[in-house]
Amino acid sequence: MKLTQMLSLMALCVSTASAQTNLGTGIDRANMNLKANPGTDFFEYAAGGWNNSHPLTPEHSRYAQFDLLTEQTQKNLRGMIEQLAEKNAPQGTIEQKIGSLYRLATDSLRRNQEDYAPIKPFLAEIDAIKSRQGVQFEVAKLLTMGIGTFFALGCEADLKDSEWNLMQLYQDGLSMGERDYYFKDDEATQKVREAFKTYVAQLFSLTGCNAEDAARNAQTVMALETKLAEDFYDAVKLRDVEGNYHKMTYRALLEDFPGIDWGTVMLLNGIPSFENICVGQPEAIRKAEKILAEESIDDLKVYLTYKVLDNAASSLSDRFREATFNFYQHAMSGAEQDKPRWKRGIDVVNHTLGMAIGKVYVEKYFPETSKQRMTELVRNLQHALGERIDAQKWMSPETKQKAHEKLNAFRVKIGYPDTWMDYSKLDIDDKLSFYENLLRARRFMSDYYVEKRVNKRVDRDEWLMTPQTVNAYYNPTTNEICFPAGILQPPFFQADADDACNYGAIGVVIGHEMTHGFDDQGSQFDKDGNLSNWWTEADAKSFKERTSVMEHFFNNLEVLPGLNCNGKLTLGENIADHGGLQIAFTALQNAMKEHPLPTLDGFTPEQRFFLSYGLIWGNNIREEALRQRVMTDPHSPGKLRVNGALPHIDAWYEAFHITKKSPLFVPKKERVDVW
């Protein structure tokens, strides 16, 4: 079952524990490049020293502040998890499940001996298919294994009736994720496509297929996925909330999409009868029907075989793991070396038993004082956003009133959940292979959410991130902002740190998530989380005009020679960064009315605010990863989240005396003016 998607600070969630960095009371000049001019390259000025002292290592395609926290925590998690792995905990206890899963993930000798034996039964089933009915059955069965061949199922809040969950049907099946990988003609994208065909051929070769047949199979898979991609929604179209909402009855699904055996899909996946479903991308589902009806059975079997191989490769022997790394991490993202096995083992445990690990994490690493201070900061930021709403001269009193109602209805989650996920029905068995246990875990998660969500009311207390995640999110259907314990640590937050630094880092993060409730997507949802218009016609038009300034500005920012940022794809996140900065700066000014801050380390409070913001986006990134993110990520690259965002903040100009002669200068009438 696919889970809820939310608007988050970063595209990729990373899990972490307490960091070693100490903010102290001011700015660490070693993180800066004081030779840089803040009006020319503020990113380099604020984070140049950090970037120089944290170069890319072979295993990283990007190394950012977020990744540093991951590095620092993995040592802590390794100690905790390996201690459990060394114990002979009773079967069925959470300690046994964590320890056994980690042992299975890191037992290279056993996995190399087994090679691809764990998936041979599945490959044999596909090979035995003789009919289209058999293909349909296998498509449904693979879905129970977490393998999406043509579509994915989920269950999450109904966008227009947010009190209730609604079954969801999504496009799925593209190995490269984004449809543009299949059609763009630039050299870099063509190179990725060739690497993909090499990867597919290698997977078949590793199972004993001769070179000629392996190459032919790769062409078959490439051709079939390209056909599927023709009617896929791209990353920009997927951001169209109304355009991805097509609610219908289950009977209508059977009538409108008769080319897929929905009865078998629902039966095998344990989904009880339900009345309604949302078909997110109907054109892609129609294309799936067409492919299932028209492609030869042999070609469909090749595709299904590849899907099993691709899904399992990273969990099999080293030779399969190397193949999947060479494509997904190296060819697509630029990493030169795979992660050590122990890190991969920790990732697996974190992904599979995340809430169980999270419970131990918060007990050991998250002080209650952090939650108290964070609660105070959130309250201050909410007050500041209320002031910002009132200050918008382009908004009518009617729309302002609705905006205040939504702001006042925000649900706030900090640190960790009050109730924890129950893993008692998950059985991890050392006698089975690593991959077989992963399949058990996937089925457990699917069954868990089927039972929890299908035909049920939305659980508004549910957390969509684990506590150890270094990220934050806004969920429009519950109108909630969430700040896991993982992000409440330096350089983002420190309970006793200088207010200017805290407001410039975690303060902007808080404001960022709040602004998501009022960005181009979140603004379409009311205070109760329903997709419902609450704007006057004139205000909605003015809002669109103002945000279009942001879109066009980022469209003109060059990421690499010949490659610009996608202003439409990144619009929501850019609005959130802009709003986060404005709100947090207002909150800092309010705080300083009662508690004035001195100049520290040669920097005024206002300067420390912006320097702290610039530092949290410090990163080094490979060209391949940058190209991938520009194509798929709704967040702008880290450098542009600094050099693209700050020129639209009037206070930044005043703090650093930025003049018209500065390259980053944007004339006031051309600056974004929203929130």
What name fits each language-model region?
Residues 1-21:
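Bacterial Sec-dependent N-terminal signal peptides
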Residues 29, 53-57, 153-156, 178-180, ...:
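Short, solvent-exposed loop/turn and secondary-structure capping segments
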Residues 36-40, 45-109:
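Active-site-surrounding "flap" and adjacent substrate/cofactor-binding loops of secreted or lumenal enzymes
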Residues 84-376, 380:
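Noncatalytic, helix-rich "gating/capping" subdomain that lines the substrate-entry/channel surface
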